[in-house]
From Swiss-Prot:
This is Pre-mRNA-splicing factor CWC21. Keywords: Coiled coil, Cytoplasm, mRNA processing, mRNA splicing, Nucleus, Spliceosome. Involved in pre-mRNA splicing. May function at or prior to the first catalytic step of splicing at the catalytic center of the spliceosome, together with ISY1. May do so by stabilizing the catalytic center or the position of the RNA substrate. Residues 53-97 are annotated as: Interaction with PRP8. It comes from Saccharomyces cerevisiae (strain ATCC 204508 / S288c).
Length: 135
Protein backbone atom coordinates (compact mmCIF):
# COMPACT_ATOMS: atom_id res chain seq x y z
CA UNK A 1 0.00 0.00 0.00
CA UNK A 2 2.93 2.37 0.32
CA UNK A 3 5.33 3.45 -2.37
CA UNK A 4 8.80 4.74 -1.50
CA UNK A 5 7.66 5.26 2.07
CA UNK A 6 4.73 7.41 0.99
CA UNK A 7 1.18 6.36 1.73
CA UNK A 8 -0.56 4.16 4.23
CA UNK A 9 1.15 1.14 5.72
CA UNK A 10 -2.20 -0.60 5.55
CA UNK A 11 -5.45 0.53 3.97
CA UNK A 12 -7.35 -1.37 6.62
CA UNK A 13 -9.65 0.92 8.62
CA UNK A 14 -8.84 4.04 6.58
CA UNK A 15 -11.96 3.95 4.39
CA UNK A 16 -9.70 4.26 1.34
CA UNK A 17 -8.28 1.85 -1.17
CA UNK A 18 -4.78 2.94 -0.20
CA UNK A 19 -3.94 3.90 -3.79
CA UNK A 20 -1.01 6.36 -3.92
CA UNK A 21 -1.04 9.08 -6.59
CA UNK A 22 1.61 11.46 -7.82
CA UNK A 23 1.42 14.93 -6.31
CA UNK A 24 0.47 17.44 -8.97
CA UNK A 25 1.58 20.27 -6.68
CA UNK A 26 5.26 19.40 -6.86
CA UNK A 27 6.88 21.22 -9.73
CA UNK A 28 10.65 21.18 -9.67
CA UNK A 29 11.13 22.65 -13.13
CA UNK A 30 12.38 26.21 -13.35
CA UNK A 31 10.78 28.82 -15.55
CA UNK A 32 12.80 29.94 -18.54
CA UNK A 33 14.56 33.14 -17.54
CA UNK A 34 14.76 34.82 -20.93
CA UNK A 35 17.57 37.04 -22.07
CA UNK A 36 19.79 39.17 -19.84
CA UNK A 37 17.94 42.29 -20.99
CA UNK A 38 14.53 40.83 -20.07
CA UNK A 39 15.82 39.80 -16.63
CA UNK A 40 17.20 43.30 -16.08
CA UNK A 41 13.88 44.88 -17.11
CA UNK A 42 11.99 42.61 -14.68
CA UNK A 43 14.38 43.46 -11.85
CA UNK A 44 14.05 47.20 -12.56
CA UNK A 45 10.25 46.92 -12.60
CA UNK A 46 10.31 45.09 -9.25
CA UNK A 47 12.63 47.71 -7.73
CA UNK A 48 10.43 50.55 -9.01
CA UNK A 49 7.26 48.93 -7.67
CA UNK A 50 8.81 48.30 -4.27
CA UNK A 51 10.13 51.88 -4.13
CA UNK A 52 6.66 53.28 -4.94
CA UNK A 53 5.11 51.16 -2.20
CA UNK A 54 7.79 52.19 0.28
CA UNK A 55 7.07 55.87 -0.30
CA UNK A 56 3.31 55.54 0.16
CA UNK A 57 3.01 54.79 3.86
CA UNK A 58 3.86 58.37 4.88
CA UNK A 59 0.92 59.81 2.96
CA UNK A 60 -1.38 56.96 3.92
CA UNK A 61 -0.40 57.24 7.57
CA UNK A 62 -1.15 60.98 7.48
CA UNK A 63 -4.59 60.31 5.96
CA UNK A 64 -5.38 57.69 8.59
CA UNK A 65 -4.25 60.03 11.36
CA UNK A 66 -6.45 62.84 9.99
CA UNK A 67 -9.41 60.48 9.70
CA UNK A 68 -9.01 59.26 13.29
CA UNK A 69 -8.82 62.83 14.61
CA UNK A 70 -11.99 63.81 12.73
CA UNK A 71 -13.65 60.63 13.97
CA UNK A 72 -12.76 61.57 17.56
CA UNK A 73 -14.55 64.91 17.05
CA UNK A 74 -17.66 63.11 15.82
CA UNK A 75 -17.53 60.71 18.78
CA UNK A 76 -17.52 63.64 21.20
CA UNK A 77 -20.45 65.24 19.36
CA UNK A 78 -22.34 61.94 19.43
CA UNK A 79 -21.72 61.55 23.17
CA UNK A 80 -23.08 65.07 23.77
CA UNK A 81 -26.16 64.29 21.66
CA UNK A 82 -26.81 61.06 23.60
CA UNK A 83 -26.46 62.83 26.94
CA UNK A 84 -28.81 65.66 25.92
CA UNK A 85 -31.38 63.25 24.49
CA UNK A 86 -31.35 61.21 27.71
CA UNK A 87 -32.06 64.34 29.77
CA UNK A 88 -35.15 65.10 27.65
CA UNK A 89 -35.15 68.77 28.71
CA UNK A 90 -34.24 70.28 25.33
CA UNK A 91 -36.04 70.16 22.00
CA UNK A 92 -34.52 68.42 18.99
CA UNK A 93 -33.63 71.78 17.41
CA UNK A 94 -31.79 72.95 20.54
CA UNK A 95 -29.88 69.66 20.71
CA UNK A 96 -28.90 70.07 17.04
CA UNK A 97 -27.69 73.63 17.67
CA UNK A 98 -25.59 72.57 20.67
CA UNK A 99 -24.09 69.67 18.72
CA UNK A 100 -23.26 71.90 15.75
CA UNK A 101 -21.67 74.45 18.09
CA UNK A 102 -19.50 71.77 19.72
CA UNK A 103 -18.55 70.34 16.30
CA UNK A 104 -17.56 73.82 15.05
CA UNK A 105 -15.54 74.52 18.21
CA UNK A 106 -13.69 71.19 18.08
CA UNK A 107 -13.08 71.49 14.33
CA UNK A 108 -11.64 74.99 14.74
CA UNK A 109 -9.38 73.79 17.56
CA UNK A 110 -8.23 70.84 15.43
CA UNK A 111 -7.55 73.08 12.41
CA UNK A 112 -5.56 75.49 14.58
CA UNK A 113 -3.57 72.57 15.97
CA UNK A 114 -2.89 71.36 12.40
CA UNK A 115 -1.77 74.83 11.37
CA UNK A 116 0.56 75.14 14.36
CA UNK A 117 2.07 71.70 13.81
CA UNK A 118 2.70 72.50 10.12
CA UNK A 119 4.57 75.68 11.10
CA UNK A 120 7.10 73.71 13.12
CA UNK A 121 7.68 70.83 10.72
CA UNK A 122 11.39 70.26 10.05
CA UNK A 123 12.53 71.31 6.60
CA UNK A 124 13.49 67.80 5.52
CA UNK A 125 10.06 66.44 6.50
CA UNK A 126 8.30 69.27 4.62
CA UNK A 127 10.33 68.57 1.48
CA UNK A 128 9.60 64.85 1.51
CA UNK A 129 5.90 65.53 2.14
CA UNK A 130 5.79 67.97 -0.80
CA UNK A 131 7.54 65.42 -3.02
CA UNK A 132 4.93 62.80 -2.14
CA UNK A 133 2.10 65.22 -2.90
CA UNK A 134 3.44 65.99 -6.37
CA UNK A 135 3.94 62.33 -7.34
Amino acid sequence: MSYNGIGLKSAKGSSTSGHVQRSLASNNRRRPQGSQQQRQQRQNAIKKASHDKASRPLAVQKQIETHMEKREIEVQVSELRDRLEEEETLSEEQIDKKCEALRAKLTNEWQEQQRMSSLYTPRKARLTEEQHRHE
